[in-house]
Regions:
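C-terminal structural segment of proteins
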Residues: 1-282
Length: 282
């Protein structure tokens, strides 16, 4: 299906983009990679009068390695997949990026675009929520930073205001010191959106954080399950115990959810934890 007619603006500076955003208001959409926006336009789910293509703004291409990692709005999945920075955090980021769709999508799709799209099945909302990321928003009124857990308000619903552009995603300094991680992404076929996904991360102080993705209305934290996981060297819960704890938390948080989906997510969490202990992440 062909795209509907629209007016295209290609600013070269952020100031120019923000001026366009303020002038065009709700009649315009901001596009970085277009891997979610353009298909929605083809199927007439969205019909903006204008697109503001920010992919040529050099200031938004920066990928700062830390100690507080920061990814500009035009940093693609492929940029993350092929980054050369060392350490467990970047091993996790690379593995996560490499598992997204196919090469053409990873070459155009952006990390921040995934957050703004806020599809519950998207990959980056899960990982960046678990790492306590924040989103930087800019407008002619100024800048503000919003924690990702507050930024995503629901399925495809975020805190971006009509005159704002999401310009970066940033990780806190503690994320650079994580010691181990495990992730699990269940798909019907390679390259598809996940039917269930899970992430377990251990911080430098030994504490764990456990999150689920591909679940409505957005990423779900499992603090009780994380509390079961001890520091390295201590007695570990069994896979069955992890799955049972996760299932209890899912049922409590989503009492009207699909029981089969809840079971899939619980098993994904158990696999993610198991891989974290083994030092194997797939």
């Amino acid at each position: 299906m062909k795209l509907p007619p629209f007016e295209l603006h290609v600013p070269r500076t952020l100031d120019e983009a923000l001026a366009l955003r303020a002038a065009l208001g709700s009649d315009a959409k901001v596009m970085a990679g277009g891997q979610s926006l353009l298909p929605m336009m083809r199927y007439r789910m969205l019909r903006p009068y204008a697109l503001i293509d920010i992919s040529r703004i050099e200031a938004l291409t920066r990928f700062d390695a830390g100690p507080a990692v920061r990814m500009g709005a035009v940093v693609t999945h492929a940029d993350v997949e092929h980054c050369a920075h060392p350490g467990p955090l970047f091993d996790l980021l690379r593995a996560h990026a490499a598992d997204i769709a196919f090469v053409p999508v990873r070459s155009r799709g952006t990390v921040v675009g995934s957050l703004v799209h806020a599809d519950p099945a998207g990959d980056w909302p899960l990982l960046l929520a678990a790492l306590e990321a924040s989103v930087e928003l800019a407008s002619l009124r100024g800048r503000r930073t919003v924690a990702l857990r507050d930024f995503v308000r629901g399925a495809m619903d975020t805190d971006v205001q009509v005159d704002e552009i999401a310009v970066a995603a940033a990780l806190p300094a503690w994320a650079s010191g994580l010691t181990r991680w495990g992730r699990c992404k269940l798909m019907h076929r390679a390259g598809e959106f996940a039917s269930a996904s899970a992430l377990a991360v251990q911080r430098a102080d030994g504490r764990w954080t456990c999150w689920l993705g591909a679940i409505d209305p957005g990423p779900l934290e499992l603090p009780a399950t994380a509390g079961l996981l001890p520091p390295a060297g201590a007695a570990r819960p069994t896979r069955e115990e992890v799955a049972a704890s996760a299932l209890d938390e899912i049922r409590a948080a989503r009492p009207h959810g699909d029981p089969l989906a809840a079971s899939r997510h619980a098993q994904a969490m158990a696999r993610a934890v198991e891989q974290a202990w083994q030092g194997v992440s797939t």
